[in-house]
């Protein structure tokens, strides 16, 4: 669920998902278009694409179990959808951590008008 993804982001990056990622670049937050602006934005388009593959799952609201062991997230047992959603969120949260060095506060609330390039496909 988005609540768990938000928690993973905080645990991985030390930043709250809102406001630091909810409106970042062209792809973080709801929807997206154009080209990703940097590594952080690329994490978000990859996450969007991961969710797109789970067409029969309720990606935003399905609750899943996970734990943090030795600094790594482990997705718990659950339905196929719950496990896949957890994996999408886990990979994205870890990607956001790896991208912290290139995070730019100037892209934190990025105007849609700057996302006009042709959109990337999954």
UniProtKB/Swiss-Prot annotation:
SMART domains: PA2c (SM00085). Pfam families: Phospholip_A2_1. It comes from the Eukaryota. Its cofactor is Ca(2+). InterPro entries: PLipase_A2, PLipase_A2_Asp_AS, PLipase_A2_dom, PLipase_A2_dom_sf, PLipase_A2_His_AS. One of its GO terms (biological process) is phospholipid metabolic process. SUPFAM superfamilies: Phospholipase A2, PLA2 (SSF48619). Binds 1 Ca(2+) ion. Keywords: Calcium, Disulfide bond, Hydrolase, Lipid degradation, Lipid metabolism, Metal-binding, Myotoxin, Neurotoxin, Secreted, Toxin. This is Basic phospholipase A2 Cdr-13. The lineage of its organism: Eukaryota, Metazoa, Chordata, Craniata, Vertebrata.
């Amino acid at each position: 669920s988005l609540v768990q993804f938000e928690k993973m982001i905080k645990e991985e990056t030390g930043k709250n998902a809102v406001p630091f990622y909810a409106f970042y670049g062209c792809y973080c937050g709801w929807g997206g278009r154009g080209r990703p602006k940097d590594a952080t934005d690329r994490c978000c388009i990859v996450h969007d694409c991961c969710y797109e593959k789970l067409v029969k799952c309720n990606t935003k609201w399905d609750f899943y179990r996970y734990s943090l062991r030795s600094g790594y997230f482990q997705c718990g047992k659950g339905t196929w959808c719950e496990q896949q959603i957890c994996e999408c969120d886990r990979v994205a949260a870890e990607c956001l951590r790896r991208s912290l060095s290139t995070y730019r506060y100037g892209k934190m609330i990025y105007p849609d008008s700057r996302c006009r390039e042709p959109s990337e496909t999954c």
